[in-house]
Amino acid sequence: EYSIKARVVILAASACSTARILLNSKSTKHPNGLGNSSNLVGKYLHDSTGADRMAFIPDLMNRKRYNEDGVGGMHVYTPWWLDNKKLDFPRGYHLEVWGGMGMPSYGFGFDPNMFNKFFGEKVGGYGDHLRADVKKYYGSMVGISGRGESIAMKENYCEIDPDTVDEYGIPVLRFHYKWSDFEKKQAVHMNDTFEEILENMSGKLLGERPGVD
């Protein structure tokens, strides 16, 4: 058993690893783990909600090619715009727009044959035909991701696993987590928003909408 005396002790090992260290630091004085007299260490665990949608944008076909590495994600960012609106979920989310002519995977996320099959065009080819298809679709896909705030609930928590240890023999965490209806409704709102934006860009949505089942 070790002890340290200091005016302030800061443990910054990330959310879950910090809880793991504290919960594993049991002693006669701290039977519940260090700093856990409230029995709340590891509780109210929460993460971002997230959803994504992609679309093929015909107006972006056959455009002049140049390097777009680094454009997308947090570089094209829309903060929450519906503050104080009446919605069926609390909090909000932001949008991250991505796509463009970047490496790898041709810059559009799928190989040209998958696009040709999706649009009912001739599949296959090599040489000049394949090169033309790659250039035609290159940079023509746009995706939108949403990242939102979930509600912290006491029922979502991590605790020390009584049966599993890491390679050093130190007990690991096990997790108890479930989404509430608020997060599910937020994800539905995300997808509705993404589809509205992409369809107003004359985009053709790719793949099935998440959560249809």
Regions found by a protein language model. Give the residues of each.
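A broad structural signal for short, well-ordered beta-strand segments within beta-sheet-rich domains
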Residues: 1, 141, 154, 202-203, ...
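Glycine-rich loop(s) and the adjacent beta-strand/alpha-helix scaffold that form part
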Residues: 1-69
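Conserved aromatic-histidine-acidic binding/catalytic patches
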Residues: 9, 148, 182, 186
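Generic, well-ordered alpha-helical scaffold segments in large soluble proteins
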Residues: 12, 24-25, 48, 163, ...
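Generic structural signal for well-ordered, non-membrane alpha-helical segments
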Residues: 14, 70, 153, 183-187, ...
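Short helix-capping/linker segments at secondary-structure and domain boundaries
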Residues: 28-30, 152-154, 201-205
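FAD cofactor-binding and catalytic pocket of flavoenzymes
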Residues: 38-173, 181
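Mobile, glycine/GP-rich and aromatic-enriched active-site lid/loop segments adjacent to catalytic centers
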Residues: 118-124, 174-176, 180-213
